Amino acid sequence: VRIRMPIEDKLSDKNLLTKLLKYDYLINFVNSKTDVYKLSEFVGEIVRDFKPGIYNAVHSNPLSTKEVVEILKDYNLVNEKWNFIPYDELDIKANRSNCVLSNHKSSTVFNFDWGDEEVYLRLNASLIEKRKEWKNEL
């Protein structure tokens, strides 16, 4: 099972949304993403009806970094220092990859609906926003 850029409703170190909030300089690539809760549903399908193979566990209709940032802004998840720069200006130690994977095989072999990427990004962002509000109320 292959995943790309995991997203979830917790601000964990591996969560793409956490990473974007921490970075000041961003590049605008389109990449596939994987909601970790939807991934667990998919793994359940594999367990129930195992069929060997390599399966891409990613959502349909991948979004660009700019589109993801706009969604985060809709939920008051913002880094005021965000600045989109060309890839060659990014100060990095290792090259970055941009990768769009097809979920066709995982969808058809297991009759699994990965759903639209934007829906899962909005769901996770809204839960993070609510969690921040709850902490402020305590």
Where are these regions (language model features)?
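Alpha-helical elements of Rossmann-like donor-binding domains used by nucleotide-donor carbohydrate transfer enzymes
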Residues: 15-19, 25, 38-45, 67-71, ...
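Hydrophobic residues at beta-strand termini and immediately following loops
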Residues: 1, 26-27, 57, 85, ...
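NAD(P)-dependent short-chain dehydrogenase/reductase
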Residues: 1-38
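A secondary-structure boundary/capping signal
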Residues: 2-3, 59, 102
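Mid/C-terminal beta-alpha module of Rossmann-like enzyme folds, strongest
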Residues: 42-98, 129-137
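Amphipathic alpha-helical segment in the mid-to-C-terminal domain
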Residues: 36, 65, 113-117
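Amphipathic terminal alpha-helices
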Residues: 107, 111-138
